[in-house]
């Protein structure tokens, strides 16, 4: 959804702790820190709704021919991928198919694949965002192995806080809420507690 230079800048900030507004000022410091990190990060941008799953597959194959095998793929974001059938189906069916194809791509590449999705209006200022708040097609939730949500109220945004909710975990516990520190100026996100709370715990505290 964002331009490749903006995405790359956010990674620079997250890795080095330099605020986004100061990235150009501390270019040498950033370069010195990042060059010591093993591995590579490839950021590929496509115009909105121009890329389908085959487009991404072709790019991955091109990288493999250059001896770059991805350990993880992040798609920003699945809902904006162009359907293979030209958009003839209802949107909810399109999204379900897109997410199934993303899962298939992860299996082919033998690596984790992450993407994001939007919430509906009920999740805009919710204390905890559950799967019921995920917009458009609920069926895409059935495809995922792991789903977490990030919620931030107006007060959270002022205090650099938030919550992460484990909405689905095919291979482990779910239904847990963890407090977050979240400073968007430097893209710093930290889970503050190793012991999760349930949604009911959060509701009782806020009532």
Would you name each region that the model predicts?
Residues 32, 53-73, 86-89, 107-109, ...:
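C-terminal regions of RecA-like/P-loop NTPase motor modules
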Residues 2-69, 83, 177-179:
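Cytosolic-facing regulatory segments adjacent to core modules
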Residues 71-115:
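Helical hairpin unit composed of two closely spaced alpha helices linked by a short loop
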Residues 4, 79, 121:
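Short, glycine/acidic-enriched loop or turn micro-motifs at the edges of active sites
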Residues 44-46, 75-78, 116-117, 150-151, ...:
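Generic beta-strand/beta-sheet core signal
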Residues 1, 43, 76, 102, ...:
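Conserved RecA-like P-loop NTPase ATPase core
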Residues 36-41, 102-113, 143-145:
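A structural motif corresponding to the C-terminal end of an alpha-helix
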Residues 4, 95, 99, 134-140:
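Amphipathic alpha-helical segments in well-structured domains
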């Amino acid at each position: 959804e964002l331009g490749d230079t903006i995405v790359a800048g956010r990674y620079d900030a997250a890795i080095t702790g330099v605020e986004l507004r100061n990235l150009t000022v501390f270019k040498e410091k950033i370069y010195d820190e990042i060059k010591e990190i093993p591995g590579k990060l490839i950021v590929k941008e496509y115009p909105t709704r121009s890329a389908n799953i085959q487009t991404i597959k072709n790019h991955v194959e091109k990288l493999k021919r250059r001896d770059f095998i991805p350990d993880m793929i992040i798609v920003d974001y699945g809902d904006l991928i162009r359907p293979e059938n030209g958009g003839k189906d209802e949107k909810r069916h399109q999204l379900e198919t897109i997410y199934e194809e993303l899962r298939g791509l992860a299996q082919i590449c033998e690596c984790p694949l992450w993407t994001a999705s939007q919430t509906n209006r009920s999740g805009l200022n919710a204390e905890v965002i559950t799967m019921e708040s995920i917009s458009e097609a609920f069926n895409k939730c059935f495809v995922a192995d792991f789903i977490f949500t990030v919620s931030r109220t107006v007060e959270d945004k002022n205090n650099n806080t938030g919550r992460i909710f484990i909405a689905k975990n095919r291979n482990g516990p779910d239904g847990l809420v963890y407090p977050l520190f979240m400073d968007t100026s430097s893209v710093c996100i930290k889970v503050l507690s190793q012991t999760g709370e349930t949604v009911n715990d959060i509701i009782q505290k806020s009532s």
